[in-house]
Curated annotation (Swiss-Prot):
Native organism: Microchaete diplosiphon
Principal location listed in the UniProt entry: membrane
Keywords from the named record: Antenna complex, Membrane, Photosynthesis, Phycobilisome, Thylakoid
Name of the protein: Phycobilisome 31.6 kDa linker polypeptide, phycocyanin-associated, rod
The protein's role, per its UniProt record: Rod linker protein, associated with phycocyanin. Linker polypeptides determine the state of aggregation and the location of the disk-shaped phycobiliprotein units within the phycobilisome and modulate their spectroscopic properties in order to mediate a directed and optimal energy transfer.
Lineage: Bacteria, Bacillati, Cyanobacteriota, Cyanophyceae, Nostocales
Source superkingdom: Bacteria
Amino acid sequence: MPITTAASRLGTSAFSNAAPIELRSNTNKAEIAQVIAAIYRQVLGNDYVLQSERLKGLESLLTNGNITVQEFVRQLAKSNLYKSKFFSNNFHSRVTELNFKHLLGRAPYDESEIIYHLDLYQTKGYEADIDSYIDSAEYQTNFADNIVPYYRGFNNQLGQKTVGFTRIFQLYRGYATSDRSQIPGASARLANELARNSASTVIAPAGSNNGFAYRASVKGKTPSTAFQGSQAFGSGRLYRVEVAAISQPAIQVRRINKRSIHRRTIQLFPTSSTSQWQIASVTPL
C-alpha cells in the first residue's frame, strides 16, 4: 500500500497489511462465517446489523456453496435491509456515492459516472443499477467471483485516477465509523467537487491527529470568492483562511469554524497560534 508511512495519521492502518478476503473451495464453516461478516461490513458501510436483520437464507446458500460471494453481494445490495439503510433516506447522488464505495471500493471519478447511474435508475430501475456495478468489468477484474469487495481507493492500481485517492477520504471517515453515523447526514459528500471537476484536500478521519478532523463549513459569513481584488484590502492577492476549534481529549458537543480574509497569510499566524484554534485551510481567492 502506497500510504503505509502515513497510514496511522490518515486512519487507514487497519488496511495497510490486510490481504483481500476470499472464499476458497476448501474453506471451513468458521472461515465462511468470517467471509460473511466481511461482506456485511463492506456492503453495509460498517453499520451494525441486528441478528434479526441478517439474511439467513442468503447466508445458508453461500455456506452450502450454492452461490458465490459476488452473488451474495448482489442480493444484499438489492435487499430491503440495504434499501432501508442507504436508499430510502438519502439523496440519490449520495446513494450513488455509497454504491461506488460499497460495491467497487472507490469514490466516483467524475460527474459523468453520477449522471450515468442516475439515468440508469430512472429508466431501468434500482435492481438494474445495482447489476451495473456487480456485472461491470471493473468488479470482475478486481474481485472476480469470490473476493469480498474492499477499499481500493487507498491503493494505486492500473486504470485508477489519482483524484480517487483524495475523494475516498470524503466517504471514508475512520475504521470505527459507519456510513449512517457521519455528521453531514444524508447529503452528498462529492456533489460540489464533482460539478467543479476539482480535487479536495485529504482530510484525516476522526480519531486521528489527536481527534481533530476538519470539515469545511457548509455556510459561512465570509465570501468564498473575490473578484479583481478588494478595495477594502487594497491591491494584491487575497486568501480565505478558515480556522476550527481544536478537539480536546474530552468529548466535544459543538464544533465552531470561523472564516476570515487576509491579504497576506503571514498576518494570520502570530494571532492564530493559540491553544484554542487551529488553521484548517488556506485558499487563494
